[in-house]
């Protein structure tokens, strides 16, 4: 499983999403990727997953298919782990 976290520079609600991503990554159970939608690569990935708001977190399986998504919100750590 992989958690993709989409943020942007001027997003006031993005710091909690980044903190959650860091905690989850440190636990080592899920791979975490951070994407900044102000950058070309981040924007392209956001378009692929239909991310229209930040922060957004997309949980993907090994084939990069979406399993669960939190668009425009930050889930709790427990909500993420329930979907694994």
Model-found features: residue ranges?
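Thiol-based oxidoreductase modules, predominantly thioredoxin-like and allied folds used
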Residues: 30-42
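N-terminal beta-loop-helix "entrance" segment that forms/cooperates
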Residues: 40-50
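Structural micro-motif
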Residues: 49-58
